[in-house]
Design a protein with these regions (language model features):
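Bacterial N-terminal signal peptides that target proteins for export
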Residues: 2-13
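C-terminal motif of bacterial Sec signal peptides marking the signal peptidase cleavage site
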Residues: 19-26
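Disordered, low-complexity segments in secreted/periplasmic proteins that are enriched in proline
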Residues: 30-62, 66, 304-308, 408-428, ...
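N-terminal domain-start segments of secreted/luminal proteins
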Residues: 47-128, 159
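Extracellular beta-helix/beta-solenoid repeat scaffolds
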Residues: 108-171, 473-475, 479
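Acidic/polar low-complexity surface segments
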Residues: 146, 161-188, 198-200, 205-218, ...
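Surface beta-strand/loop "capping" patches
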Residues: 478-486, 490-532, 536-537
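Exposed aromatic-hydrophobic patches
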Residues: 537-545
């Protein structure tokens, strides 16, 4: 049994972004010339339009109609064309210097053509809105960002329908001002990506797309490869929809504001995501909220630099504040935790398949699950929090240590970087199960609370340890059951039953015969039947119909015993709370069993069936 919760971060509100106005630079070095036609302003779409509908109340707060608008008026737009000989523009609102173009005024700009060393710069008034339409454009810059938003109120980058576009940076970034440009797309202000085409972003030495304000993506298809983070937003990353293939040397999505810790959130309404990263799949400095989408995330350290001292964080979805998930499909293969919050994790829907080297789901404070389907196929500990509350959903988990673990404290390695096995304890910890169907296969404790354990409903099935000093049920405070089905099998050395304050009967029975477990009442009616997948020496059984004053027939494998419930609790186990037992062994064993009780427990531990 081990614990170690990670340092609690501040719970953040979703706030609007600051606008920062600073001057910056470019890539090419030829003499500037200015083109000669009239500039254009953004007008209502006359080509096509598309918007992303959402039933979520947050959607209108996260995105404007303009964020989702992919249409543009080509007849009034400024044309910018790249070629091997340089660039041209159809308006004096664009200055051209070789293969570097600088947009200076509000309007719509359609970019076409290819350059192997060019740049698009937006350097306009800080109240200006600019739409850049990429129409089979390919822009590579050898020493800076291919698209550099130096100043504007907001820039919209739209991929034209059925087009393929590229923005890339190669080589080391050469700084010519104090803005520290370090991405293939670098924006000092708000930037939104949308469209009905494809965009490939490549950064050999830095990030893929960076916004020092809000980064929004509402539609389109994106393939981003970066040495560092693929998507990075200082104040927020907000995604309405779209398809994303992200390959990164650090995080897939990274939102962080070290100047204002109330900012740096991630909000995803929908989308399809394939993330292969050497950092975290999704990393939010404050909150992470996901409404829907498909997420295939693989996060593993760089094998060439992996060591016991490597501080890289390699979690699936991580947040300094709350993680809230209400839907979606998640396939998470992570070297560290699958879901990790320094505050609370709340799951109300979605389908999860998680394979991890540490915790499947971890919260420093509370983990709440009220719906969804969660399959944790591999983990050190399955579900963890100071408080764990399960009221619905279907959960199947496999753990090499504890299945469900409630404890308190902080795991110093949890958010800042690498991971260690959790190792903490707290009497304030609690596990509450009121609904859902839970199946646990644990090599350590099946259900382990350093405080209380309360079961009021649901179905819980535990395949606990087959030997050693762990048990299928382990608690330090009080354990009560008032409803639901709870069956836990495991070794008998540290077996515990529920306590006498329970209102639903619970029995603990020792046995030397593993196999199907059946409980029948005195009329021969089957109250519960269950077949564990592992051998066991002890079983805890509680279900509706088990009451004081009745006699039950319990069969485990080929052994049978008759249990008379003279108390609400039959057999207290090695370290359980007070309880009494009585029964007639119908096999060849003795009445008293062979287990030694711990503090507060019964010395007999329940009858042993042979």
């Amino acid at each position: 049994m081990s614990f170690n919760l990670k340092s609690k971060g501040k719970f953040a509100a979703l706030l609007a972004a600051l606008i920062i106005s600073v001057s910056v630079t470019g890539c090419a070095n030829t003499d500037e010339k200015t083109s000669s036609t009239n500039s254009s302003t953004v007008t209502k779409d006359s080509v096509s339009s598309a918007s992303i509908a959402s039933d979520e109340s947050l959607d209108s707060d996260m995105f404007t109609d303009r964020d989702k608008e992919v249409g543009y008026d080509e007849s009034s737009a400024v044309m910018v064309a790249f070629s091997s000989s340089g660039a041209t523009a159809s308006s004096d609102s664009v200055s051209v210097s070789g293969s570097k173009v600088t947009i200076k005024s509000e309007g719509t700009y359609i970019v076409t053509g290819t350059t192997s060393d060019g740049q698009i710069i937006v350097d306009a008034d800080n109240k200006t809105k600019v739409q850049i339409v990429l129409k089979n454009a390919s822009v590579t810059c050898k020493s800076s960002a291919a698209l550099y938003v130096k100043q504007a109120d907001k820039v919209f980058v739209t991929t034209a329908k059925d087009t393929e576009n590229t923005l890339a940076s190669t080589g080391d970034y050469v700084q010519t001002d104090d803005n520290n440009v370090d991405a293939a797309v670098f924006a000092k202000d708000d930037i939104t990506f949308n469209g009905e085409g494809k965009l490939t972003v490549t950064s050999e030495k830095g990030h893929g797309i960076v916004s020092k304000d809000d980064l929004k993506l509402t539609s389109g298809e994106y393939n981003i490869t970066a040495a560092s983070h693929a998507l990075s937003g200082k104040n927020s990353i907000r995604i309405a929809s779209g398809t994303y293939t992200l390959t990164s040397g650090k995080d897939g999505l990274h939102a962080e504001n070290t100047d204002d810790t109330s900012k740096g959130f991630v909000y995803i309404a929908d989308g399809k995501f394939t993330v292969n990263c050497k950092g975290d799949g999704i990393d939010a400095g404050t909150t992470a909220q996901i409404e829907n989408g498909t997420f295939n995330i693989t996060s593993n350290r760089d094998s060439s630099s992996s060591s016991s001292t490597d501080s890289a964080s390699v979690k699936g979805i991580k947040a300094g504040g709350d993680i809230t998930i209400s839907g979606g499909t998640f396939n998470l293969t992570c070297e560290d935790d699958g879901l990790h919050s320094n505050s609370n994790v709340t799951v109300s829907g979605g389908t999860f398949t998680i394979s991890t080297g540490d915790d499947g789901i971890h919260a420093d404070s509370k983990t709440s699950i009220s719906g969804g389907t969660i399959n944790i196929t591999e983990s050190y500990e399955g579900i963890e929090g100071t408080e764990v509350e399960i009221s619905g959903g279907t959960i199947n988990l496999k753990s090499s240590d504890d299945g469900i673990n409630a404890a308190g404290g902080k795991d110093e390695s949890g958010f800042g970087g690498g991971f260690d096995r959790d190792n903490f304890g707290s009497s304030d910890a609690s596990i509450t199960i009121s609904g859902g169907k839970i199946t646990i296969d644990a090599d350590g404790d099946g259900v382990d609370s350093n405080g209380s354990l309360t079961v009021t409903g649901g179905e819980t099935y535990v395949f606990g340890p087959t030997s050693g000093d762990n048990g299928a049920v382990d608690y330090d405070g009080e354990a009560t059951i008032t409803g639901g089905i709870f069956i836990a099998t495991g070794s008998s050395q540290m077996a515990q039953n529920f306590g006498e304050n329970s209102t639903q009967g619970s029995m603990l029975v020792n046995t030397n015969s593993s196999g199907e477990i059946t409980v029948k009442n005195s009329d021969g009616d089957v109250l519960v039947s269950f077949t564990p997948t592992k051998t066991y020496a002890c079983v805890v059984i509680s279900c509706p119909g088990i009451t004081t004053g009745q006699t039950y027939t319990v069969t485990t494998g080929d052994s049978t015993t008759e249990v008379e419930m003279t108390s609400i609790i039959y057999g207290s186990g090695g370290m359980g709370g007070p309880g009494s037992m009585s029964g007639r062994n119908m096999g060849n064993g003795d009445m008293n069993g062979n287990e030694m009780g711990g503090p507060g427990g019964d010395m007999r531990g329940g009858p042993q069936m042979r």
